[in-house]
Amino acid sequence: MGFITKAIPIVLAALSTVDGAKILEAGPHAETIPNKYIVVMKQDVSHEAFNAHATWVGNNFSRRPMRRGGSFKPMAGMQHKFSLGGTFKAYTGEFDEAMIKDISNHDDVDFIERDTVVKATAITQQDNVPSWGLARVGSKEAGGSTYYYDDTAGKGVTAYIIDTGIDIHHGDFGGRAKWGKNFVDKMDEDCNGHGSHVAGTVGGTKFGVAKGVNLVAVKVLDCEGSGSNSGVIMGMEWAMKEASGGGNSTAKAAGKSVMNMSLGGPRSEASNKAAKAIADAGIFMAVAAGNDNMDAQHSSPASEPSICTVAASSEDDSKADFSNYGAVVDIYAPGNEITSVKPGNGTDTLSGTSMASPHVCGLGAYLIGLGKEGGPGLCDTIKEMATDAIKNPGEGTTGKLIYNGSGK
C-alpha cells in the first residue's frame, strides 16, 4: 500500500512563453498524464471573466478537432472548472500542444501545469503489531500504554478524509462516517484500505484521536491508491464547499471542519494554491510530508505554508527513517507501525507520513470540540502545545511532537 509517486526533488521549470503565461513542467521523474493540463487563472480574474474565458476555450476547441496520438478517439477539451473561495480559479482539460499554446497566450491565464499522478503515503504493512500512537499523543513522555483524553472532544466537528474512501460500515466508526463524493471511479467503497485506516486514526472509537468526530469520505484515489492531481483538486473543491455550509461560505461552518490529505506528488503550484484557498476559507487542514527522506519543499501539497504539514515519528521519539523533513514541516506525529481500521471490520498496521497526518487532523478536531478556534491558526496552537521530543528531526526541521494537553 503506497503513497505518492516518489516526490523527487524537482524545480518547476518554465517552458514558455515570453508574453504569455508560463507552462510549467514537473520534471523528468514526475508521472504525467498525456495531454492533461491544469490551467490556473490570475487571482484578480472575476467570475464573469472566468466564464467568458471558458466559452472562448469551448468555441476555440470546437473549431479544431483534436485526437489523441495513435487513436481515433477525440480529446475531451475542458473537463472541470474549479473555484475555491475568491482566490483560486482554474480548470482541467485535455488539449494538444497548439491549443495549450493559445490558452497560455490568453491575458487571464496565470500559469499552466501538466496533470500528474498522485498516490497515497503509507509505505509498509505489518500485521498484529500493537499500536502506540494514541498513548503518545496523550502523554508528555514516551513508553506509555494509556491514551488520556476528554471523551467529549471532537463532537460537533466534521472531518473530511480526502483519500481512497472509507468503509463507513466498519464498527469502529459507530455510525459517524458517511460517504461524501467520488472523483476517481464508480465504486463508492474503499477498495484499497488506506482511507479507512486514516479515518480510523482521526476518529475511530477504538483507534481515533477524536472519538466523537463525524467523518466524510472524499474519494480521489483508486483501488491502487493512485489518482490525478486534477482529481485531487476536485475533491478539495467539493470538501471546501461542503465544509463552508454547502457552498455558502460561513466562518462558523468552516471553523467546525477539518481536512486530512495523506497523499501527495511532485511540487505543484496549482495544488498549493488550492490548499491555500482552503486555509483562507478558515478550514484546518493536515497533510502528509511524504515518505522519501528528503526535504518536503519538493512535494505538494506539503510545501504549502498555510496548511499543517506533518512528519512521522517512531516509538522511541526518533524521526521515522522514511519521513520527509525540512522547514515546511510544522509538527511531528506518530507514523511508524500504527494500527487502525481495515475494511471489513478488520484492523491493519501501517507506516508512513499518511499515518502521522491523521493524528494531527484528529487532534485539530479534538481541540475544536474543546472550544479552541478552528482554521489554519489551529496549527500554531498545536505547535504551542507540543513537546520538544524528536531526536535528530532533520536539517532545519522542528523537533516538536504533538500532545493533546491531557496533563499526563
Swiss-Prot record:
One GO cellular component term noted in the UniProt record for this chain: extracellular region
Protein name per the record: Subtilisin-like protease 6
Cited SUPFAM superfamilies: Protease propeptides/inhibitors, Subtilisin-like
EC number: 3.4.21.-
Gene that encodes it: SUB6
Signal peptide range in chain numbering: 1-20
Highest rank taxon of the organism: Eukaryota
Location in or out of the cell: Secreted
Native source organism of the sequence: Arthroderma gypseum (strain ATCC MYA-4604 / CBS 118893) (Microsporum gypseum)
Biological function: Secreted subtilisin-like serine protease with keratinolytic activity that contributes to pathogenicity.
